[in-house]
Design a protein with these regions (language model features):
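A short, Trp-centered hydrophobic/proline-enriched beta-strand micro-motif
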Residues: 80-89
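Internal helix-loop-helix
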Residues: 5-72, 76, 80-81, 128-133
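Cysteine-centered functional microenvironments
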Residues: 20, 88-92
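Active-site loops and adjacent core secondary-structure elements that bind or stabilize anionic groups
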Residues: 1
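A short core secondary-structure module
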Residues: 111, 115-152, 156
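Active-site-adjacent elements of ketosynthase-type condensing enzymes
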Residues: 94-100
Length: 159
């Protein structure tokens, strides 16, 4: 119960989306605000404040690289803190060397089939929000670089 009340307090303060554009419900504050307030939060409870930090990374990624449709659909709920976000990067064979990633994403109609194994997904499962947006690093066929695939609807990931 404590962590839910703490997250509600953080969410209601506007901290989660403080540096996001106002058009998505954010505060429009400079990024230095996030750095300073994040340092204070991390000093008090690093494990907890990883959640909003990971959400911030997901928001910035969608803001910078997402289509207009993705921005309109997901940023308001992430910015408000109603949803949280993660980055699914680490695999057993590549801790910090992401070039060794083996997970693939194969296009099928209007979605992708992901094949691979991710480990250590910080804040990948919790009960603080009704939904968690997962940005999954994977290889697409014929793509020269790695890609991020979003899993955005409440779903159960299968082993």
């Amino acid at each position: 119960m404590y962590k839910r009340q703490l997250y509600k307090t953080v969410r209601d303060s506007g901290y989660v989306g403080a540096t996001m554009p106002t058009e998505f419900g954010g505060g429009g504050a400079p990024f230095t605000t996030a750095i300073l307030s994040g340092e204070i939060g991390i000093a008090s409870n690093m494990a907890f404040y990883m959640g909003p930090g990971l959400s911030h990374g997901a928001m910035k990624t969608i803001l910078k690289k997402g289509s207009e449709e993705l921005k309109q659909k997901y940023l308001p709920k992430l910015v408000s803190g109603e949803w949280m976000g993660t980055m699914c990067l680490t695999e057993p064979q590549c801790g910090t060397d992401l070039g060794l990633i083996k997970t693939t994403a194969n296009p099928i109609d209007d979605h992708y089939e992901l094949n691979g194994q991710k480990i250590w997904i910080s804040f990948g499962e919790h009960d603080l929000t009704e939904n968690i947006i997962h940005l999954v690093l994977a290889k697409l066929p014929d793509a020269p670089d790695l890609s991020l695939i979003h899993i955005s609807e409440p779903t159960r990931l299968l082993a």
